[in-house]
């Protein structure tokens, strides 16, 4: 995308508001090593902002032929030690926010690009502060409207007008 290829990798940004999956894209600009840090999201009220968007889940479907075996497998691979998560990070760049990984040696390693800070431990710790919210079928659409409102505000529109417009559009889509 233009955002990734031109803005981030073209060294045209002062910050990146995104999830941990964007880290390899940032690291591709090797001359920026040591210039980046991980932080929370700014908030309107001045508090610390923690958020999560995306992720994954592991499920045992109704069609599973051996539910007990599937449960045992998941408990063994993902419920015991941090080894599975450590290997996923080290070998594939897959980051978890499972709290026990904050104590893992792998998650506590410094990352050279980020001033040798243990950014993966920081991500896990930040994940522990994300509030639980109820999501609906309109969760992602609401995000699109809010992102548009932010962009329009940055480009000169009034924040209150943009937020009201975003709410109006979402309510219309929801049939309210």
Predicted regions and their residues:
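Short, well-ordered loop/turn and helix-capping segments at boundaries between secondary-structure elements
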Residues: 66, 79, 83, 155-156, ...
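Acidic/polar loop patches that form or flank catalytic/metal-binding clefts of enzymes
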Residues: 1, 16, 35-38, 84-88
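Structural recognition of the beta-strand scaffold that forms the well-ordered cores
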Residues: 14-18, 37-40, 59-60
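C-terminal lobe and pocket-closing loops
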Residues: 22-32, 44-144
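Non-transmembrane alpha-helical segments in soluble domains
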Residues: 5, 9, 61, 70-79, ...
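Residues that flank catalytic or metal-binding motifs in active/ligand-binding sites
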Residues: 4, 11, 34, 54-56
